[in-house]
């Protein structure tokens, strides 16, 4: 259940904690008497929690990662929801970097779609408010096979992105053409991409619950996630490390994106919704920042920046974040998921996000932040 791993430069050291090991940070935090954590831990089996907390230390030119895990297991399935938008954004930037005629500022639209956008705007919308349509446009540009291959080639695995989000024909294996505006008078049309058929996943917990809603009708029996996206904690953490600290990895594990593209991505990851024009009353600072601040709508302190991507759907909340405090000179990573579906019925939009899930993740972030302040 409890595991600790250290990554020093390019060397990985792994060791499991024994009963005689002093209490590790996650063990201490998850033993908290705060009801936001305690109530979840008292019903642990219900919530399918997985957590990876990464301490970050610097030694000369080396970045040292020390990972602490709680119940992290690639074979135990959880639905990743919108966290899959992070790899889509990275893969899209890498593909753009290889095409001389395109950039993040290139206007385009998907054939059959009335919205004209740019790649940069789509990426900003993905991180600021977790826009599903923006993600789907990037997936039409990439195709599922190309996205998955790019991740796997850089060591971000296991991963299986199979479908779009919240749209008709989400699992269509053929992408739609994109129309690009290359200058004021020239347009270019991309060709549809035919992707591999989706194969069912064979993982623990791939069928969940006692019933589900389909076509507005209740269906008895577990909900089958075997054809859904798969993006476990280990892969999420691996991608975050490679984007925040590319220098800690060999060249073949770094994404081929330009410095300008990476700067744009990092800015998008920590930008607050109001900073790019969204109504701050509806899209408050912590709208998509679950750790530390997710359980309140107050403005976030300016000295704390959270580079992250959240996901929430089917009762599953996930956040993958790099948290930086510029005033106190601390930094750490945290990736966690929790299931909050008390009635065990899926797709009914009756989940305990606000009552249990977000408060748990917020308090988890706060307690680990306090540990970072003291170490």
Regions found by a protein language model. Give the residues of each.
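Sec-dependent signal peptide recognition
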Residues: 2-8
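Active-site-adjacent helix/loop patches that line small-molecule binding or acyl-intermediate pockets
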Residues: 22-33, 46-47, 114-253
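Residue-level preference for non-acidic, small/hydrophobic
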Residues: 85-92, 126, 151, 236, ...
């Amino acid at each position: 259940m409890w595991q600790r791993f250290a990554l020093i430069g390019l060397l990985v050291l792994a060791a499991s904690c024994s009963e005689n090991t002093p209490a590790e940070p996650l063990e201490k935090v998850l033993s908290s008497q705060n009801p936001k954590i305690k109530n979840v831990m008292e019903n642990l089996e219900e919530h399918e929690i997985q957590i990876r907390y990464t301490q970050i230390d610097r030694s000369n030119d080396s970045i040292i990662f020390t990972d602490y895990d709680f119940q992290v297991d690639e074979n135990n399935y959880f639905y990743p929801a919108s966290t899959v938008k992070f790899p889509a954004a990275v893969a899209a930037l890498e593909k753009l970097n290889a095409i001389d005629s395109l950039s993040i500022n290139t206007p385009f639209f998907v054939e059959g779609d009335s919205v004209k956008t740019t790649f940069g705007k789509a990426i900003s919308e993905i991180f600021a408010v977790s826009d599903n349509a923006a993600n789907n446009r990037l997936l039409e540009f990439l195709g599922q096979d190309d996205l998955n291959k790019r991740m796997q080639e850089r060591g971000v695995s296991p991963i299986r992105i199979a479908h779009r989000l919240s749209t008709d024909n989400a699992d269509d294996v053929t992408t739609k053409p994109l129309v690009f505006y290359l200058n004021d008078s020239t347009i270019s049309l991309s060709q549809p991409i035919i992707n591999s058929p989706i194969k069912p996943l064979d993982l623990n917990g791939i069928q969940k619950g006692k019933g589900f809603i389909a076509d507005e009708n209740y269906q008895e029996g577990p909900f089958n996630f075997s054809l859904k996206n798969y993006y476990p904690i280990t892969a999420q953490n691996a991608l975050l490390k490679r984007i925040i600290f590319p220098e800690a990895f060999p060249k073949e594990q770094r994404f081929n994106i330009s410095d300008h593209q990476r700067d744009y991505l990092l800015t998008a990851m920590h930008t607050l919704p109001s900073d790019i024009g969204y109504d701050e009353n509806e899209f408050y600072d912590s709208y998509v920042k679950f750790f530390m601040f997710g359980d309140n709508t107050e403005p976030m302190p300016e000295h704390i920046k959270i580079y992250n991507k959240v996901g929430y759907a089917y009762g599953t909340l996930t956040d993958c974040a790099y948290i930086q405090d510029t005033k106190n000179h601390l930094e750490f990573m945290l990736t966690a998921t929790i299931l909050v579906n008390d009635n065990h019925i899926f797709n009914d939009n009756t989940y305990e996000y606000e009552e249990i899930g977000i408060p748990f993740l917020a308090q988890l972030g706060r307690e680990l932040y306090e540990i970072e302040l003291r170490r």
